[in-house]
């Protein structure tokens, strides 16, 4: 018996809602941009992978920014892989950009983290590029209005967070503001999580100081406002990932809003990551749900955390193997002023999941 046209249409619409295809993080494919591409003419913008029309237009009008944004894309991949290296989902699928699997195409907890991290990373990289003088359109951040304490003075070159936030959000949010970019629920989710990433970035701005004085006495400290490293921001976002709230798209009055699924008596908090679709346990390989599985992943036999062999291997057990490690040893300090070391080799036992 052939399925009815109505059934096929309903199935198609259901698939669209489940995948929630959105182009918001496809720009991470810029990480693959060849270094030989000079990016000094506006026609080069069309050659860049993963950009939507509005991002191509931003590229043409802000050509000097693009090398910095390419660097941000590389930082997102490196930082995400490092942050989740000890978990079943290890962010490996981010390297498939712009052709993601369902772990990042759907409105999952994992996509929530990547959207937040990518929004933070692009603003972070631009803010730092202003400080180092790599961008002609910006310079150091403003001197804070508050008076520093005794023995302190404002100086140095602050990270230009304000410029980073303005230009970063223009670029990273552009795909979600297109009319044809997935379901409304997914767009709202991605915009919310991107803003959470920028909030964590703003909260990371801290006072950094350098000592001045006779014989290193540090009688005066020159201080400026600087951002924490992206890896620290990613760790804060990972904690939000672990406590993320599942939401539903529910009518309230004449409009629909995202509200917590299990506690919809309160609105979504501005500081929490949110997701629409539950994730698999990532134990077994299943590309239909975007899971690479944990077979052959390295695990820690003595750990009680997420990298433990019990958790990482999902109860399947693990295999030991011997690995040779070369490290520096027998180091000697020579006056003045250098250190020489020998190279020593030792064998260590490691474990991989069955």
UniProtKB/Swiss-Prot annotation:
Coiled coil: none annotated. InterPro entries: Wnt, Wnt_C, Wnt_CS. A lipid is attached at residue 215 (O-palmitoleoyl serine). One of its GO terms (biological process) is secondary palate development. SMART domains: WNT1. Keywords: Developmental protein, Disulfide bond, Extracellular matrix, Glycoprotein, Lipoprotein, Secreted, Signal, Wnt signaling pathway. It holds the Pfam family wnt. Residues 1-24 form the signal peptide. Disulfide bonds join 80-91, 130-138, 140-157, 209-223, 211-218, 283-314, 299-309, 313-353, 329-344, 331-341, 336-337. Belongs to the Wnt family. This is Protein Wnt-11. It comes from Coturnix japonica (Japanese quail).
């Amino acid at each position: 018996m052939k399925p009815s046209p109505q059934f096929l249409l309903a199935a198609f619409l259901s698939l669209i809602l489940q995948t929630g295809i959105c182009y918001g993080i496809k720009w991470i494919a810029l990480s693959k941009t060849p270094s030989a591409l000079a990016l000094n003419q506006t026609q080069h913008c069309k050659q860049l992978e993963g950009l939507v029309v509005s991002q191509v237009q931003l590229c043409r009008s802000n050509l000097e920014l693009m090398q910095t944004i390419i660097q941000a894309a590389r930082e997102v991949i490196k930082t995400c892989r490092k942050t989740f290296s000890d978990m079943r989902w290890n962010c490996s699928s981010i390297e498939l950009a712009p052709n993601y699997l369902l772990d990042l195409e759907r409105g999952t907890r994992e996509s929530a983290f990547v959207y937040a991290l990518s929004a933070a990373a692009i603003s972070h990289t631009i803010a730092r590029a202003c400080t180092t003088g790599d961008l002609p359109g910006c310079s150091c951040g403003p001197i804070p209005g508050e008076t520093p304490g005794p023995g302190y003075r404002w100086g140095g070159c602050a990270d230009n967070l304000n410029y980073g936030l303005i230009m970063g959000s223009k670029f990273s949010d552009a795909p979600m503001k297109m009319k044809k970019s997935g379901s409304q629920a997914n767009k709202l989710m991605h915009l919310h999580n991107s803003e959470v990433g920028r909030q964590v970035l703003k909260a990371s701005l801290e006072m950094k100081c350098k000592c001045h004085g006779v014989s290193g006495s540090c009688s005066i400290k020159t201080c400026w406002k600087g951002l924490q490293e992206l890896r620290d921001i990613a760790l804060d976002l990972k904690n939000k990932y672990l406590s993320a709230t599942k939401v539903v798209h529910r009518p309230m009055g004449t409009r629909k809003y995202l509200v917590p699924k299990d506690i919809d008596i309160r609105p979504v908090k501005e500081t929490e990551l949110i997701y629409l679709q539950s994730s698999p346990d990532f134990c077994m390989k299943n590309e239909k749900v975007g899971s690479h599985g944990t077979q052959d992943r390295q695990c820690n036999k003595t750990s009680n955390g997420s990298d433990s062999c019990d958790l990482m291997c999902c109860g399947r057990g693990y295999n030991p193997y011997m690995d040779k490690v070369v490290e520096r040893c027998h180091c000697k300090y020579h006056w003045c002023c250098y250190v020489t070391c020998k190279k020593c080799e030792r064998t260590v036992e490691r474990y991989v999941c069955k």
